Amino acid sequence: MPQNSKYSDTQFENVMHDIIIALEKHQASRDLSLMALGNVITNIFMQQVNESQRSEMADKFTQVLLKSINAK
């Protein structure tokens, strides 16, 4: 997912690598991977985002995700 971020490319790539390795280690199917990642995202929203900002942030996240998967 393309991003403009305060995080370095290296830091981002390292986190992505670790997530992918974990999914591969458990031989997670596409559906299981999406379920697990969805639950991780939900947990992040519930634990790290103020309740008053969750809906707006979730909408923005969804828009970025759709833009990313529809990019040609």
Swiss-Prot record:
It comes from the Bacteria. Belongs to the UPF0352 family. InterPro entries: UPF0352, YejL_sf. This is UPF0352 protein Patl_3379. Coiled coil: none annotated.
